Regions:
Chain B
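Helical segment within the ABC ATPase nucleotide-binding domain
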Residues: 172-185
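A short, proline-enriched helix->beta-strand linker immediately N-terminal to the Walker B motif
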Residues: 151-155
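Catalytic Walker B motif of ABC-type/P-loop ATPase nucleotide-binding domains
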Residues: 157-161
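ABC ATPase "signature
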Residues: 217-218
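Conserved H-loop
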Residues: 186-194
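A short, surface-exposed alpha-helical micro-motif characterized by mixed small hydrophobic
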Residues: 199-201
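Conserved ABC transporter NBD signature motif
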Residues: 64-72, 79-80
């Protein structure tokens, strides 16, 4: 129950941030996507994930800055709440917000294709939705881990440039796959969706455990 | 305003040890009997805040035990904190929340949260429920901390310099409330302060810390008895901690 209360608190604190962020992302994405010629398949979809990746980062930054700015983790620690509960709640609220953010962008993609605004591939499948969401959760979890382990939302800016590398990889994944001979591995993961999703979730759970352990063993909490 | 205490437990601190940079807190031991008001005295940097934060688990100890009514502060963290109310010198709240929102956020964590008492305390301390915490003065934020610390009717109240930097009116209001919870509710109190007048006014016992060690632990009544009419806490303190 404590986890739910902590998540509810974060959702309340972020309510004025999430809607403008999503509106900005949707309009920003549409402004670019509608200019992309339809004969370049996959670019608009790559761009969609690029926008969502920056959204993942901003969501993490916002949820962490709410604690950092007010040094509120110090206050939370005085309540009858365990350290793992604090960490799980932080990951939980991010999973919810990133799910909502990516979900809206994917719905925009699906709707766009359905109504003929966007003509390029791919069509939205369950596989694409699941893999897309999982990758965004992983991306966001990476930033939360950095922020919690170093007890500072400022720390998340250090790996921020890596986001652009990830976006470039997404946009050029077909070529990268060929050059690095990753086809068999990617094919396997594509065939065994559950294995792929399971692997990513194992990493996310690993991040949660690592953060709980680090915070528990830190000299000063927060 | 009916302030009651949920249990009569004694707080025991046993050989508490911690290192923070080049500062060492060395073998801090004391026990506070139920209903007793104990003042933690010492110069700046003596280890008062560190001791309180160690008890609350905000700072990790190197060695030692802290228990309240048989609950260890690390092993039984939740049960331990259910029985404690803590007021920090600086109130680290979410500044965007209103006072009422903060109370609503904190209340579900405590099994014994008393909504009626919380409302009464807000009223008695003249706190505006709809005001954002970021817009409150330091004194008001300390009062909010006190409301949060008292509304679950803890058996022990830990206060880190609760009246420091407050105007005389806020200071008097807070001391009045403290007297009420100790005398009427029988709550055990451990508070750190630099104000010797406050100690003389409300404490039963004092613990003097110096450079991370307990220098003295005395009952004020015994000291007054020993010294007679010439009793002066300031002289006693300065003789011990030059």
């Amino acid at each position: 129950m404590n986890i739910i209360h902590l998540i509810a608190k974060d959702l309340r604190l972020q309510r004025n941030f999430v809607l403008p962020l999503m509106l900005l992302e949707v309009t920003g994405y549409l402004a670019y996507a509608l200019q992309i010629p339809s004969h370049i398949p996959g670019v608009a979809f790559g761009l969609l994930h690029g926008v969502a990746l920056i959204g993942d980062f901003l969501i993490c930054h916002r949820t962490m800055i709410a604690e950092e700015k007010n040094r509120a983790l110090m206050f939370i620690k005085t309540l009858p709440v365990s350290t793992p509960e604090i960490v799980i709640a932080k990951f939980g609220v991010n999973i919810l917000l990133v799910g909502l953010n990516t979900g809206i962008l994917l719905a925009l993609w699906g709707g766009g294709r359905e109504f003929g605004w966007i003509e390029v591939a791919p069509s939205l499948t369950t596989h694409l939705v699941l893999v897309g969401l999982t990758m965004h959760w992983l991306n966001n979890a990476f930033f939360i881990t950095i922020s919690l382990v170093f007890s500072s939302e400022h720390a998340v800016w250090v790996p921020f440039p890596a986001l652009f590398v990830v976006i470039t990889v997404i946009l050029n994944f077909k070529q990268i796959k060929i050059v690095l001979h990753l086809e068999p591995f990617v094919d396997l993961l594509q065939r065994r969706e559950a294995l792929f999703v399971g692997l990513i979730w194992a990493i996310i759970v690993g991040f949660v455990v690592m953060c709980s352990w680090t915070l528990k063993h830190k000299r000063i909490f927060a | 305003m009916g302030v009651t205490s949920i249990a009569q437990d004694s707080l025991t601190v046993d050989r508490l040890r911690a290192r923070l940079g080049d500062f060492w807190l060395n073998d801090i031991s004391f026990s506070i009997a139920p209903g007793q008001v104990t003042a933690l005295l010492g110069h700046n940097g003596a280890g008062k805040t560190t001791t309180l934060r160690l008890i609350m688990g905000i700072i990790r100890k190197d060695f030692g035990h802290v228990s309240l009514g048989g609950f260890d502060h690390v092993r039984d963290e939740k049960e331990f904190k259910q029985r404690i109310g803590f007021v920090q010198e600086e109130s680290f709240f979410y500044k965007g929340m209103t006072v009422r929102e903060l109370c609503a956020f904190v209340s579900p964590f405590y099994g014994a949260w008393n909504k009626g008492l919380s409302r009464q305390l807000l009223q008695a301390l003249d706190l505006p429920g709809d005001k954002k915490l970021g817009h409150l003065s330091k004194g008001m934020r300390t009062k909010v901390s006190l409301v949060l610390a008292l509304s679950h009717e803890p058996s022990v109240l830990l206060l880190d310099e609760p009246t420091s930097g407050l105007d005389p009116r806020a200071r008097v209001e807070i001391l009045k409330l403290l007297r009420k919870v100790t005398h009427e509710g029988g709550t055990t109190v451990l508070f750190s302060t630099h104000n010797l007048h406050e100690v003389d006014e409300i404490a039963d016992r004092l613990i003097i810390l110096d450079r991370g060690r307990v220098l003295a632990e005395e009952s004020l009544a015994a000291l007054r008895c020993k010294t007679g009419p010439s009793w002066n806490l300031e002289h006693y303190y300065l003789a011990l901690v030059p």
